[in-house]
Protein backbone atom coordinates (compact mmCIF):
# COMPACT_ATOMS: atom_id res chain seq x y z
CA UNK A 1 0.00 0.00 0.00
CA UNK A 2 1.57 3.26 -1.12
CA UNK A 3 1.29 6.73 0.42
CA UNK A 4 0.34 5.49 3.88
CA UNK A 5 2.60 7.92 5.70
CA UNK A 6 1.29 10.93 7.60
CA UNK A 7 2.64 14.40 6.98
CA UNK A 8 4.70 16.10 9.68
CA UNK A 9 2.85 18.41 12.08
CA UNK A 10 3.95 21.27 14.29
CA UNK A 11 3.73 20.89 18.06
CA UNK A 12 1.00 23.52 18.05
CA UNK A 13 -1.06 21.56 15.53
CA UNK A 14 -0.59 18.38 17.56
CA UNK A 15 -1.83 20.13 20.69
CA UNK A 16 -4.91 21.36 18.80
CA UNK A 17 -5.48 17.87 17.37
CA UNK A 18 -5.41 16.39 20.90
CA UNK A 19 -8.09 18.85 22.04
CA UNK A 20 -10.25 18.35 18.96
CA UNK A 21 -10.02 14.53 18.98
CA UNK A 22 -10.59 14.30 22.74
CA UNK A 23 -13.68 16.50 22.48
CA UNK A 24 -15.02 14.55 19.51
CA UNK A 25 -14.43 11.17 21.16
CA UNK A 26 -16.01 12.23 24.46
CA UNK A 27 -18.98 14.29 23.24
CA UNK A 28 -19.36 13.80 19.48
CA UNK A 29 -19.12 17.56 18.98
CA UNK A 30 -16.71 19.61 16.94
CA UNK A 31 -14.51 22.30 18.45
CA UNK A 32 -14.99 25.79 17.06
CA UNK A 33 -11.82 27.75 16.36
CA UNK A 34 -12.86 30.44 18.86
CA UNK A 35 -13.18 27.78 21.57
CA UNK A 36 -9.51 26.85 21.34
CA UNK A 37 -7.19 28.30 23.97
CA UNK A 38 -6.05 31.74 22.83
CA UNK A 39 -2.39 30.70 22.70
CA UNK A 40 -3.28 28.11 20.02
CA UNK A 41 -5.16 30.50 17.74
CA UNK A 42 -2.79 31.63 15.01
CA UNK A 43 -5.33 33.26 12.69
CA UNK A 44 -6.91 36.64 13.31
CA UNK A 45 -10.05 35.60 11.44
CA UNK A 46 -12.55 34.54 14.10
CA UNK A 47 -15.64 35.16 11.95
CA UNK A 48 -15.34 32.47 9.28
CA UNK A 49 -13.85 28.99 8.87
CA UNK A 50 -14.50 28.34 12.54
CA UNK A 51 -14.71 24.62 11.77
CA UNK A 52 -11.16 24.47 10.44
CA UNK A 53 -10.23 21.50 12.65
CA UNK A 54 -12.35 18.38 12.02
CA UNK A 55 -12.03 14.78 13.09
CA UNK A 56 -12.79 12.16 10.46
CA UNK A 57 -15.78 10.47 12.06
CA UNK A 58 -15.63 6.80 11.17
CA UNK A 59 -18.68 5.99 13.26
CA UNK A 60 -21.09 8.04 11.13
CA UNK A 61 -23.07 6.51 8.24
CA UNK A 62 -21.44 8.92 5.80
CA UNK A 63 -17.97 10.28 5.10
CA UNK A 64 -17.04 13.91 4.93
CA UNK A 65 -16.09 15.13 1.48
CA UNK A 66 -12.39 14.95 0.70
CA UNK A 67 -11.42 18.19 -1.04
CA UNK A 68 -8.22 19.27 -2.78
CA UNK A 69 -7.41 21.61 0.12
CA UNK A 70 -6.20 18.51 1.96
CA UNK A 71 -2.98 19.02 -0.02
CA UNK A 72 -2.32 22.24 1.94
CA UNK A 73 -2.91 20.96 5.47
CA UNK A 74 -4.78 18.15 7.14
CA UNK A 75 -6.76 20.18 9.66
CA UNK A 76 -10.15 19.18 8.21
CA UNK A 77 -9.11 15.52 8.23
CA UNK A 78 -7.77 14.61 11.67
CA UNK A 79 -7.45 10.91 12.47
CA UNK A 80 -9.94 9.91 15.23
CA UNK A 81 -7.42 7.81 17.19
CA UNK A 82 -5.94 10.16 19.78
CA UNK A 83 -2.96 7.82 20.20
CA UNK A 84 -1.99 8.46 16.58
CA UNK A 85 -2.54 12.24 16.84
CA UNK A 86 -2.18 13.17 13.18
CA UNK A 87 -4.10 14.02 10.05
CA UNK A 88 -5.03 11.21 7.70
CA UNK A 89 -2.59 9.84 5.13
CA UNK A 90 -3.11 10.01 1.37
CA UNK A 91 -3.99 6.30 1.38
CA UNK A 92 -6.63 6.80 4.07
CA UNK A 93 -8.07 9.71 2.07
CA UNK A 94 -8.04 7.50 -1.03
CA UNK A 95 -9.94 4.79 0.84
CA UNK A 96 -12.59 7.32 1.88
CA UNK A 97 -12.87 8.22 -1.81
CA UNK A 98 -13.18 4.46 -2.55
CA UNK A 99 -9.96 4.15 -4.57
CA UNK A 100 -8.65 0.57 -4.56
CA UNK A 101 -5.49 0.03 -2.50
CA UNK A 102 -3.50 -0.84 -5.61
CA UNK A 103 -4.31 2.47 -7.34
CA UNK A 104 -1.16 4.46 -8.15
CA UNK A 105 -1.29 8.24 -8.05
CA UNK A 106 0.71 9.95 -10.78
CA UNK A 107 3.40 12.51 -10.06
CA UNK A 108 5.74 14.73 -11.99
CA UNK A 109 8.93 13.11 -13.25
CA UNK A 110 8.02 9.84 -11.55
CA UNK A 111 8.91 11.12 -8.07
CA UNK A 112 6.25 10.17 -5.50
CA UNK A 113 4.58 13.27 -4.07
CA UNK A 114 2.23 13.26 -1.08
CA UNK A 115 0.97 16.72 -2.06
CA UNK A 116 0.13 15.69 -5.63
CA UNK A 117 -1.55 12.51 -4.39
CA UNK A 118 -3.71 14.55 -1.99
CA UNK A 119 -4.64 16.93 -4.85
CA UNK A 120 -5.66 14.08 -7.14
CA UNK A 121 -7.68 12.44 -4.37
CA UNK A 122 -9.38 15.70 -3.41
CA UNK A 123 -10.23 16.60 -7.01
CA UNK A 124 -11.60 13.14 -7.81
CA UNK A 125 -15.17 11.97 -7.92
CA UNK A 126 -15.34 9.01 -5.52
CA UNK A 127 -14.80 5.81 -7.48
CA UNK A 128 -18.00 4.09 -6.27
CA UNK A 129 -20.06 7.20 -6.98
CA UNK A 130 -18.66 7.45 -10.53
CA UNK A 131 -19.41 3.75 -11.05
CA UNK A 132 -23.04 4.12 -9.98
CA UNK A 133 -23.51 7.26 -12.07
CA UNK A 134 -22.18 5.33 -15.07
CA UNK A 135 -24.58 2.44 -14.39
CA UNK A 136 -27.48 4.87 -14.16
CA UNK A 137 -26.51 6.55 -17.43
CA UNK A 138 -26.11 3.19 -19.17
CA UNK A 139 -29.57 2.11 -17.99
CA UNK A 140 -31.07 5.38 -19.17
CA UNK A 141 -29.44 5.08 -22.61
CA UNK A 142 -30.59 1.45 -22.86
CA UNK A 143 -34.17 2.53 -22.06
CA UNK A 144 -34.05 5.09 -24.88
CA UNK A 145 -33.07 2.50 -27.48
Predicted features along the sequence, with ranges:
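C-terminal target-recognition/interaction regions appended to catalytic cores
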Residues: 1-145
Amino acid sequence: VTFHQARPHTEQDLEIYRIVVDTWNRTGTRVSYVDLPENLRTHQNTASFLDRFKVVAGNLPYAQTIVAHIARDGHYFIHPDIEQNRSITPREAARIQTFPDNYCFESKKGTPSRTLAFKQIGNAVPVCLAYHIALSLLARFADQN
